[in-house]
From Swiss-Prot:
Belongs to the ATPase alpha/beta chains family. It catalyses: ATP + H2O + 4 H(+)(in) = ADP + phosphate + 5 H(+)(out). The keyword Translocase applies. The lineage of its organism: Bacteria, Pseudomonadati, Pseudomonadota, Gammaproteobacteria, Pseudomonadales. It comes from Marinobacter nauticus (strain ATCC 700491 / DSM 11845 / VT8) (Marinobacter aquaeolei). This is ATP synthase subunit alpha.
């Protein structure tokens, strides 16, 4: 055995110390205890924040959701098959963020903002946290500007304002998505940017929506955030929050945006799945206790902010402009049960709801909106002049018709006034029908509603009302373009326009017999 001198020992120690690599980076690392169904239990992560991104050994990211004394429960944002017990996990020190900005317009991205449309990488470096606190009361402004959906039934009876949350609720396959897509298509010339968030839908359905938006030239002002049925529950849970952050980019810079969540029922189911796997106590319908907060903190971010807020946010770059984010959440009911847990929650959070009914849809009334129980709590202040003036009579005519129609089933002989009201109501009901992907301008809607209110439809055969409307609008566009321009997108309405519309309709009625 070789003997070492004391001096040699000190030299060896010195060399070892010189070679020692002392890194200044302190890593907060933990170890995976278990992996199952996209949920990972981790031991040893000391300084982790709620909602913080954590990185796994295979490069996949996760999000910390359960912070317990001895362990951390996290959801994996992506594929979890490569993860195994004993692998190292490290904190990133960052809250989950997604890309935002104009570069996203026209693109299809996943819940993390990664492009999935095969059009290459995004060119921007601007990001925003997925979870943000909604603007306070002082930062907000009242809703007084309209969002035109282009659908007569909605713009007349349940008007939507910029910054409003209007729920679209109904059973499956009765046109909820169709209403939202028509609203997006109608924003082509309004400057409103749109975000369509697809949660838990078939990939074929999402592809069909994207194709329709492209066909109608609406993809240029739209971002599609897709979390399909095959995506992990964590991605379906995050998609609405990611889409909202993208919409807030426009709102906070003094622009207007519209976001559609299709649909929040599937997001609630995904969150229920995550919560049960994280062993959180189940409540009503096995949903966790904070499912109301899940949707309230999301929908409160849709708002109209005042000019001071925008100026402060942009450091004085944008002055004198208000911004808005309008939300159209969709909820799917089971057999028309609107008293279930999630539907009642979202009804109480939103500023109104559009009820779509199966029996109306099956009887050919599309959009299948029940005008009696559909309501807009704040949109009335945002309605254009012509719609406000004419819309009330339309709602009244439909309400009277519903009441009399039920009564007329049992009465054999009706007096003249009742019969007239019934016939008028039938024609107004027929007039509210509208084909998909054919939104109307404010001036066109105003003309048609004026015709109904002034009795120009009363001598038209019920089966010819739709034909009458189409031919009237074609005639107005060719013969009375100046009058339509006078009404304009602002919905102007005065004595001159009233006289002009009366004269035009009388002239049109003489062109052929109805």
């Amino acid at each position: 055995m070789q003997q070492l001198n004391p001096s040699e020992i000190s030299d060896i120690i010195k060399k070892r110390i010189e070679k020692l690599d002392i890194s200044s980076e302190a890593k907060n690392e933990g170890t995976i205890l278990s992996v199952s169904d996209g949920i990972v239990l981790i031991h040893g992560l000391a300084d982790v924040m709620y909602g913080e991104m954590i990185e796994f050994a295979n490069g996949t990211y996760g999000m910390a959701l359960n912070l317990e004394r001895d362990s951390v429960g996290a959801v994996v944002l992506g594929d979890y098959e490569g993860l195994a017990e004993g692998q190292k996990v490290r904190c990133t020190g960052r809250i989950l963020e997604v890309p935002v900005g104009n570069e996203l317009l026209g693109r299809v991205v996943d819940s993390l903002g990664n492009p999935i449309d095969g059009k290459g990488e995004l060119g921007n470096s601007l990001t925003s946290p997925v979870e943000k606190v909604a603007p306070g009361v002082i930062a907000r402004q009242s809703v007084d500007e309209p969002v035109q959906t282009g659908l007569k039934a909605i713009d007349t009876m349940v008007p939507i304002g910029r910054g409003q949350r209007e729920l679209i609720i109904g059973d499956r396959q009765i046109g909820k998505t169709a209403v939202a897509i028509d609203a997006i298509i109608n924003q082509k010339h309004t400057g409103i940017k749109c975000i369509y968030v697809a949660v838990g839908q078939k990939q074929s359905s999402i592809a069909a929506v994207v194709r329709k938006l492209e066909e109608h030239g609406a993809m240029d002002h739209t971002i599609v955030v897709a979390a399909g049925a095959a995506d992990p529950a964590a991605m379906q849970f995050l998609a609405p929050y990611a889409g909202t952050s993208m919409g807030e980019f426009f709102r906070d810079r003094g622009e207007d945006a519209l976001i559609v969540y299709d649909d929040l029922s599937k997001q609630a189911v995904a969150y229920r799945q995550i919560s049960l796997l994280l062993r959180r106590p189940p409540g009503r319908e096995a949903f966790p206790g904070d499912v109301f907060y899940l949707h309230s903190r999301l929908l409160e971010r849709a708002s109209r902010v005042n000019a001071d807020y925008v100026e402060q946010f942009t450091n004085g770059e944008v002055k004198g402009k208000t911004g808005s984010l309008t939300a159209l959440p969709i909820i799917e009911t089971q057999a028309g049960d609107v008293s279930a847990f999630v539907p009642t929650n979202v009804i109480s959070i939103t500023d109104g709801q559009i009820f779509l009914e199966t029996n109306l849809f099956n009887s050919g009334i599309r959009p299948a909106m029940n005008a009696g129980i559909s309501v807009s709590r704040v949109g009335g202040a945002a309605q254009t002049k012509i719609m406000k003036k004419l819309g009330g009579n339309i709602r009244l005519a439909l309400a009277q018709y519903r009441e009399l129609a039920a009564f007329a089933q049992f009465a054999s002989d009706l007096d003249e006034a009742t019969r007239k009201q019934l016939e008028h109501g039938q024609r107004v009901t027929e007039l509210m029908k509208q084909n998909q992907y054919s939104p109307m301008t404010v001036a066109e809607m105003g003309t048609v509603l004026f015709a109904a209110n002034e009795g120009f439809l009363d001598d038209v055969d019920v089966n010819k009302v739709v034909k009458f409307e189409a031919q009237l609008l074609d005639w107005m566009r060719s013969e009375q373009k100046e009058l339509l321009d006078k009404i304009g997108p602002e919905g102007n309405f005065n004595d001159d326009i009233t006289a002009g519309l009366k004269a035009a309709l009388e002239k049109f009625k003489t062109t052929q017999s109805w």
